């Protein structure tokens, strides 16, 4: 699914939460059929937009093309109660989060 704005082409890809947290490389099909090898760094947040220059539509009367912009959507897993328990235990033991929900003032 592609959208066009001027000479830029936009698309969205689903990336699972583990790949957003840990980083990954994903192949993305461009509208012209080329495969774009997209490196998603660890800690990428959902809705991050990656810009691939010169992979959009040709710019009239120029020797250049627009950009191909790829937005990441977070694909959440369906977790069982056991999965949730294991994730909570891992988060507490590994101390990957340096904050606690109880300390947030709203």
What are these regions (language model features)?
Residues 1-106:
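Intrinsically disordered, low-complexity linker/assembly segments
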């Amino acid at each position: 699914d592609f959208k066009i704005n001027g000479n830029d082409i936009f698309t969205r890809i689903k990336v699972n939460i583990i790949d957003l947290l840990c980083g990954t490389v994903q192949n993305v099909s461009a509208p012209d059929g080329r495969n774009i090898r997209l490196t998603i760094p660890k800690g990428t947040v959902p809705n991050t937009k990656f810009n691939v220059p010169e992979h959009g539509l040709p710019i009239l009367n120029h020797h250049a093309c627009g950009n191909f912009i790829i937005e990441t959507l977070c694909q959440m897993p369906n977790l069982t109660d056991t999965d949730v328990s294991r994730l909570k235990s891992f988060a507490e033991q590994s101390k990957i989060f340096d904050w606690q929900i109880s300390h947030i003032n709203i």
